[in-house]
Amino acid sequence: MGLTTANTTLVAPQPKGILDPRTGKPVGSDDAFFNDLNSELSDKGFIVTSADALITWARTGSLMWMTFGLACCAVEMMHISMPRYDAERFGIAPRASPRQSDVMIVAGTLTNKMAPALRKVYDQMPEPRYVISMGSCANGGGYYHYSYSVVRGCDRVVPVDIYVPGCPPTAEALLYGILMLQKKIRRTGTIER
């Protein structure tokens, strides 16, 4: 019954994914983490890991970011939540409270008057906490670098983990920065000893 008359089982074709134009292979096929994971699953049928590695894996897949939009870069920051980029498919979602956030995205010109508020919000975030500096103004003052009222980079107020360049940076650049933060967390771990 149905569309075929033969009694054969229909099998879906191998998914192709996004191909890397340089290598011709699917993107991520040479990632050491996933290659190790696949080889362990095919050998044993289950995965043996440490608690540190499990917690680090869980943290990278559930980053909650807090918006600290100070200027025009905040518009591009909003774009990554829209359907075209859909940042939630990578396990990141916006939160309104610093007490529920892992990542703060500083987007825009940081003034001297706003710097204490930035530090206060950063101090309210639970450990481990991460900061992404988005745009030329947040990275180093940008166009307003020589103004008396502008902090020449938010790294003078809070420690920054990832810098996203551009004026304003595109939503793709911010998404790439978030993916690099996930890679950094995976590489360095999150548990202090």
Curated annotation (Swiss-Prot):
Reaction catalyzed: a quinone + NADH + 5 H(+)(in) = a quinol + NAD(+) + 4 H(+)(out)
Paired cysteines (S-S): none
EC category name: translocase
GO BP term (any one): electron transport coupled proton transport
UniProt function note: NDH-1 shuttles electrons from NADH, via FMN and iron-sulfur (Fe-S) centers, to quinones in the respiratory chain. Couples the redox reaction to proton translocation (for every two electrons transferred, four hydrogen ions are translocated across the cytoplasmic membrane), and thus conserves the redox energy in a proton gradient.
Residues bound to [4Fe-4S] cluster: C72, C73, C137, C167
PROSITE patterns: COMPLEX1_20K
Protein name, entry field: NADH-quinone oxidoreductase subunit B
Organism: Brucella anthropi (strain ATCC 49188 / DSM 6882 / CCUG 24695 / JCM 21032 / LMG 3331 / NBRC 15819 / NCTC 12168 / Alc 37)
